[in-house]
């Protein structure tokens, strides 16, 4: 299962759990909050894609990655001179673009983590409410059963 499938599965589970809450307004509010969080998560994925496209526009990442692999191979063999010579071939614009992208990506990941934490808090609250409603329902059922006896 990839990340998207896992998120989709969690989304379905959360919606089912939300549907178990008896208080209609609370159920509606929680469902709307959950939808908003899901949209924010989707927007995050699209933001990262856009940032990546802009950051690496006109840059040959494959060539850069091949050169980095050669540098690492030379270093692992202990050939520091060859590694240094290969490092001189690195395009400074590509290196800067990668650093800039990594900084932006890290910022976005922090935002995504905050979204996920809120989502988890919401899911935990929803689960607790559903359990509480279920417990109340069981109590009501037991009361009715004892009255009928």
Regions found by a protein language model. Name each.
Residues 1-149:
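A composition-driven surface/loop motif
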